[in-house]
Each structure stands twice: as C-alpha cells, then as structure tokens.
Curated annotation (Swiss-Prot):
Family recorded in the similarity comment: Belongs to the cytochrome b family.
Cell compartments where the protein resides: Mitochondrion inner membrane
Name under which the protein is recorded: Cytochrome b
Gene Ontology BP terms: mitochondrial electron transport, ubiquinol to cytochrome c
Transmembrane segments: 33-53, 77-98, 113-133, 178-198, 226-246, 288-308, 320-340, 347-367
Further information: Heme 1 (or BL or b562) is low-potential and absorbs at about 562 nm, and heme 2 (or BH or b566) is high-potential and absorbs at about 566 nm.
Record's keyword annotation contains Zinc: no
Binding positions (heme b b562): 83, 182
Cross-referenced Pfam families: Cytochrom_B_C, Cytochrome_B
Mode of membrane association: Multi-pass membrane protein
Binding-site list for a ubiquinone: 201
Amino acid sequence: MTNIRKTHPLAKIINNSFIDWPAPSNISAWWNFGSLLGICLILQILTGLFLAMHYTSDTATAFSSVTHICRDVNYGWIIRYMHANGASMFFICLFLHVGRGLYYGSYMYPETWNIGIILLFAVMATAFMGYVLPWGQMSFWGATVITNLLSAIPYIGTSLVEWIWGGFSVDKATLTRFFAFHFILPFIVLALAAVHLLFLHETGSNNPSGIPSDSDKIPFHPYYTIKDILGALFLILVLMMLVLFSPDLLGDPDNYIPANPLNTPPHIKPEWYFLFAYAILRSIPNKLGGVLALVFSILVLAIVPLLHTSKQRGMMFRPLSQCLFWLLVADLLTLTWIGGQPVEHPFITIGQLASILYFAILLILMPAISIIENNLLKW
C-alpha cells in the first residue's frame, strides 16, 4: 500500500516540501536560517496572540495594560519578554539569511529574492508598529519621528502624515490603528513566506559552490530536519538566556517611562535592528534625501542581481569579493553603532563615511571587483 503522505492531497504538499524534497548534499549551516525564521514567526504569532488577549490599545490604559501583563497575568512576564526578544532573534536570523543570500549568490533566483525583499519590508513595518504599542516615551517619540518622515514627500506629505496619524499628532487613533496593523501583518508575512517557499521549490536550493547540484541530491528528511532541529535548539537557548537573564538588554530604558507629548527624550532612537538604516537617514542633511536614502538602503538589494558581473555565482572561490563582503558587514556594524550615538562630532562624519561606503560597496565596488576577478581567471 502506498504511503498516505504520498497520496493524500494535503499531506502530499507537505511531503514534497519538507520530507521527500531533494536538497543539495553540501548545504552548510548558513542554510538553517530559513527554518529558524519560520520558527521565529510562529513563536511571535503565538506569543503576540496571548499578549493581545490582555493588551488594550487606548492611550490611557496601554502602558498600564503592559504592566498588568507582566505583574498579574500568569507567566505574562515571560510571554511579553519572549515576544520582545523574539523580535531581536527574528532580525538576527533575517540579517544572517540575507547575508547568506548575498555571499552565495542566492539572489540569482530573482522571484525568491524579490519576495524576500518584500518580506523584509513587511517584517520591518510590523516591528516598528509593535514598538509603538507599549506607549512608553520611546514608543511615542519613535512613532512621531518616523511617521513624520513622510511629510518630506512633496505636495501630499503633510496630508499623508495627518491621515496616518488620524489627527494632528500621534494619539489614540494612531495607537488603535497601529495595533490593528500589528495584528494583521504577521499573517500577511506568513502568506508571503509560503510564496517565498513556493518560488524556492520551483528552482531548488542554491549551495555553497554555486554549481547546479541536480546530480547529487539527498532527501530533506532525515538529513536536514535533524540539522534544523539542532539550529532551533541553539535559537531557543539564546532566546531563553536573553529572556531569563537580561530581558531588557536590547530594549531602551526610556520605554519604562509612560508616553509624554510634552517631554522629548534626549536621544530618540529606534530598536537596535533599525539603527543602521536610521544612521543612513541621519547622515543626509536634507529631509527628503534622508528618507530616500533610508528606503534605498533596503531597496538596493533589489538591484544586486542586475549588478552581478562575475562568471561565478557565489563568493566561495572569489577572495577579493570576500574581502569586500566582510568590509560591508563591518560597515553595517559601524552604522548600527552610529545610529545609537548622539548627533555630534565625530559621529556625524563617521556616519556619512559609513553610509557612502555602504552604497559604494553594493553599487560600484562589488561589480568592479567581479570584473577584475573574471580577468584574473584568464591568467
């Protein structure tokens, strides 16, 4: 009798995606992050659902409701901190996943790559709106500053900002709609992730060598399921160490002060995972220019496939490109550090140089170095 997982219409889809799916035999631990992101997303949806049962999206009670969750709800504190630090783990996995794609040339699957970029924007939007919900000082002022950036759009900017706010400032209407969007977006992300996976399974996985691996495939289960479980255990270990030992390590102390429109915090800054983009935004003195640079800092990923000039797919056998890649990583870490610093000398100059270098590496240096490497192959 044929196995039910190969005949049942629904089980067949799962079987072909996660059990009998032919995977390259040489994919490394850098290929673990897709499954880890799936785990993060499910974890965020589940913890978020339980938080939403006790949270109130009203300016008068939002801050108190979060306090109530931590103090009065059974295990509310662990759910709240798993959700907050789960977002950090989500972004760590996201950055490593995108970095893997850049390093090994996974962007040569344009459909999968472009859906990935849309996913990145959707997750960033979700995280931003989630940060507003506790209604602390940094929530309020972060929302004010970031939504205000849209006023840089010529002609319709001011009307657009007031339309998003639902009034003339960030207030009750803003909080309510942000809660609604924060609730629905993860389910949209889930649907997009399914499409992302669908496109990936049309082409099959890339591998470290960048050479087609059709002649050497192994079944996903048990080889990669066990590998993914190991990665998941590491993820949960790091997350629970954060949650149980230093839950506020990655947060901002200002967010334990209730939102006060009359008192501006000395340094308004977003969560750590947005600091690199925030540093690029602040590096440009012009408001509209800064907003465009902010959007383009992520959107630049969409033109990376068009600028691929190398004869080889990945960077495994391209030492010059590897040097540039790790320079890009160092540059992003520098931008993250600068984003959390006050706007004063020497941080302004460092931020501007790091921002120029970020775009230069992706748009100019990478394609140029690839051409040089192509010529070196002839020698």
